[in-house]
Amino acid sequence: MTGIKKPMSQYQDDNELEDWGPSKTQLKRDAEVLQKLGAEIVSLSHSELEKIPLDEELADAVELGRKLKPKKDESFRRHLQFIGRLMRSRDIEPIEEALSIIKNRHSTVNARLHRLEQWRERLITEGDSALNELMSQFHELDRQKLRQLIRSANKERELNKPPVAYREMYQYLRGEIEDLL
């Protein structure tokens, strides 16, 4: 009578309940998580995909998934299920770690660019006080060039001209200090 379910009152203790393993719902949730992980891997660029540790069978499945038309075809959904099924028998921790590194790199780059934009705005609005602070942090910058760009950007704003110096200042800062931020 091991395959027949008993009413709850007939169980001796909680250990008998644990013998059945994870519920069907939990198995479906786990499969869905792996399927979403597979979809993330398929959506990566080729250079990012090379950084993910995949065995040959899984790499072939991902490559085929990249060739299918996403979200327009039932075959793509079934293929994602197949990729999820392949990942069930593999250790997915290294794959998840590599994916998180790729995602964090994007957010780190965005944060750097945002800090550059903040410096540019401060230089234009605060003038010399922001310039002195920037120069104290980054000695290799050309103070004279920055002052000239600040004056030109302010003049462009006053005359409602296209922001040529504004953009040029950003490009200069990006070229000189982006890696240092």
UniProtKB/Swiss-Prot annotation:
Keywords: Cytoplasm, Ribosome biogenesis, RNA-binding, rRNA-binding. GO terms for cellular component: cytosol. The keyword Transmembrane does not apply. It holds the Pfam family DarP. Its main location: cytoplasm. One of its GO terms (molecular function) is ribosome binding. The keyword rRNA-binding applies. Residues 1-23 are annotated as: Disordered. It is found in: Cytoplasm. Member of a network of 50S ribosomal subunit biogenesis factors which assembles along the 30S-50S interface, preventing incorrect 23S rRNA structures from forming. Promotes peptidyl transferase center (PTC) maturation. Belongs to the DarP family. This is Dual-action ribosomal maturation protein DarP. It comes from Aeromonas salmonicida (strain A449). The lineage of its organism: Bacteria, Pseudomonadati, Pseudomonadota, Gammaproteobacteria, Aeromonadales. The gene is darP.
